[in-house]
């Protein structure tokens, strides 16, 4: 049996540009792609924390060290500069690999620079009984 697992994410990145007239995709600083284990042309989900929108597109590598997160094409209607987004990837794995898998989570600051400390992801608060 295969399972679809959360593979990696860039957590709370800031959209720097939105280019409605580009063909599509999201351009992301190549350093961030590498740190988050996202390849150019890999499918990514973008969850907009500011607006609540969600979409799927693919990643393109932007200039290293630029901090760029540019939403391209029609998705620019749903994401604007200054919005906070989560950029996530998923991968299909067999059951044994899925049970050993640890996703990569890259937290960034307001300028899309990796935070010095990268604490592990923890579950949210429990609902009261």
UniProtKB/Swiss-Prot annotation:
<comment type="subunit">
    <text>Heterooctamer of four alpha and four beta subunits.</text>
</comment>
<dbReference type="GO" id="GO:0015940">
    <property type="term" value="P:pantothenate biosynthetic process"/>
</dbReference>
<keyword id="KW-0963">Cytoplasm</keyword>
<dbReference type="GO" id="GO:0005829">
    <property type="term" value="C:cytosol"/>
</dbReference>
<dbReference type="InterPro" id="IPR003190">
    <property type="entry name" value="Asp_decarbox"/>
</dbReference>
<feature type="active site" description="Proton donor">
    <location>
        <position position="58"/>
    </location>
</feature>
<feature type="compositionally biased region" description="Pro residues">
    <location>
        <begin position="120"/>
        <end position="129"/>
    </location>
</feature>
<dbReference type="GO" id="GO:0004068">
    <property type="term" value="F:aspartate 1-decarboxylase activity"/>
</dbReference>
<comment type="function">
    <text>Catalyzes the pyruvoyl-dependent decarboxylation of aspartate to produce beta-alanine.</text>
</comment>
<comment type="similarity">
    <text>Belongs to the PanD family.</text>
</comment>
<comment type="pathway">
    <text>Cofactor biosynthesis; (R)-pantothenate biosynthesis; beta-alanine from L-aspartate: step 1/1.</text>
</comment>
<feature type="compositionally biased region" description="Basic and acidic residues">
    <location>
        <begin position="99"/>
        <end position="114"/>
    </location>
</feature>
<feature type="modified residue" description="Pyruvic acid (Ser)">
    <location>
        <position position="25"/>
    </location>
</feature>
<feature type="binding site">
    <location>
        <position position="57"/>
    </location>
    <ligand>
        <name>substrate</name>
    </ligand>
</feature>
<feature type="active site" description="Schiff-base intermediate with substrate; via pyruvic acid">
    <location>
        <position position="25"/>
    </location>
</feature>
<keyword id="KW-0704">Schiff base</keyword>
<keyword id="KW-0210">Decarboxylase</keyword>
<protein>
    <recommendedName>
        <fullName>Aspartate 1-decarboxylase</fullName>
        <ecNumber>4.1.1.11</ecNumber>
    </recommendedName>
</protein>
<dbReference type="InterPro" id="IPR009010">
    <property type="entry name" value="Asp_de-COase-like_dom_sf"/>
</dbReference>
<dbReference type="Pfam" id="PF02261">
    <property type="entry name" value="Asp_decarbox"/>
</dbReference>
<keyword id="KW-0670">Pyruvate</keyword>
<keyword id="KW-0566">Pantothenate biosynthesis</keyword>
<keyword id="KW-0456">Lyase</keyword>
<dbReference type="GO" id="GO:0006523">
    <property type="term" value="P:alanine biosynthetic process"/>
</dbReference>
<keyword id="KW-0068">Autocatalytic cleavage</keyword>
<feature type="region of interest" description="Disordered">
    <location>
        <begin position="99"/>
        <end position="129"/>
    </location>
</feature>
<feature type="binding site">
    <location>
        <begin position="73"/>
        <end position="75"/>
    </location>
    <ligand>
        <name>substrate</name>
    </ligand>
</feature>
<keyword id="KW-0865">Zymogen</keyword>
């Amino acid at each position: 049996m295969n399972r679809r697992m959360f593979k990696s994410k860039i957590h709370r990145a800031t959209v720097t540009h939105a280019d409605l007239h580009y063909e599509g995709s999201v351009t992301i600083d190549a350093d961030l792609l590498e740190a988050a284990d996202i390849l150019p042309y890999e499918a990514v989900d973008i969850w907009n924390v500011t607006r609540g929108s969600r979409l799927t597109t693919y990643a393109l590598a932007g200039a290293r060290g630029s901090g760029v997160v540019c939403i391209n094409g029609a998705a620019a209607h749903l994401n604007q500069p200054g919005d906070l987004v989560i950029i996530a990837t998923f991968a299909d794995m067999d059951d044994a690999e899925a049970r050993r898998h640890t996703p990569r989570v890259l937290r960034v600051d307001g300028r899309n620079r990796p935070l010095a400390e990268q604490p592990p992801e923890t579950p949210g608060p429990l609902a009261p009984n």
